[in-house]
């Protein structure tokens, strides 16, 4: 018997005319390049990017962690399609110089790929 697999469907698709980042494990769209804030972040497993907004991402419960820039309340984020942990969301920053991170998302480079329009 031959099994025919259904094509993957994601909760949200980003516009094809924009450069975007996708999950390295399942190719679910994650973020537009226009939402990239900084490439100068460090994740738990290496370099990471800070984004203003993301799609197809679920959020775990917030917890306090001491990161390189001080104490923050963060929630792990995962790909809604393949459930891979991608990084975290900054829920609260306790130092005034770090407040700009609140509501923003860290995605580690080893969990995303550049997709569409990167010539």
Swiss-Prot record:
Subcellular location: Nucleus, Nucleolus
Keywords attached to this entry: Apoptosis, Metal-binding, Nucleus, Ubl conjugation, Zinc
Tissue distribution: Widely expressed. Strongly expressed in heart, brain, testis, lung, spleen, liver, kidney and myeloid cells.
Chief localization: nucleus
One GO location term (cellular component): nucleolus
Domain Yippee per the UniProt entry, residue ranges: 19-116
GO biological process: apoptotic process; positive regulation of cellular senescence
Post-translational modification: Probably ubiquitinated leading to its degradation by the proteasome.
Annotated GO MF terms: metal ion binding
Inducing stimuli: Up-regulated after the removal of interleukin 3 and exposure to granulocyte colony stimulating factor.
Residues that bind Zn(2+): 23, 26, 79, 82
Annotated Pfam families: Yippee-Mis18 (PF03226)
Annotated function: Involved in proliferation and apoptosis in myeloid precursor cells.
Family: Belongs to the yippee family.
PANTHER family noted in UniProt: PROTEIN YIPPEE-LIKE CG15309-RELATED
Identification of the protein by name: Protein yippee-like 3
Species this chain originates from: Mus musculus (Mouse)
Lineage: Eukaryota, Metazoa, Chordata, Craniata, Vertebrata
